[in-house]
Amino acid sequence: MNFKGTLPTLILEALVREPSHGYLIAQRIKQRSQGVLDFKEGTLYPALHKLENDGLVESYEGMEKGRPRRYYRITESGRGTLTKDRAEWRKLSQAVTIILGEA
């Protein structure tokens, strides 16, 4: 299955509690999906940059273990988008569950 279209929503969800750097965002998604969703850097960072260009996340420089890192945090606009995306995903998920249950 291709979950690429859901990546922006998953990134926003990963950032809703606290800012994070890209690697940690990917790890959160992987852990919460029990390893099903494992996004690589080549997929994750373009999505983060698009979210930043769209004003849904913002980034800043920080340090972790003496190394510079770029951290991302969700904006108020991003929170609004996430709320809308959650509702749309629940509706879609329910419809698919109904259809698959008929098989």
What are the functions of these language-model segments?
Residues 1-2, 103:
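Absolute protein N-terminus
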Residues 52-68, 73:
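Beta-hairpin "wing" of winged helix-turn-helix
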Residues 44-51:
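Basic amphipathic alpha-helical segments that dock to polyanions
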Residues 2-43:
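N-terminal helix-turn-helix DNA-binding core of bacterial DNA-binding proteins
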Residues 27, 31, 76, 91-94:
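Generic recognition of well-ordered alpha-helical segments
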Residues 82-103:
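Amphipathic alpha-helical dimerization/coiled-coil segments
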Residues 67-86:
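Basic, amphipathic "hinge/linker" alpha-helix immediately C-terminal to the N-terminal HTH DNA-binding motif
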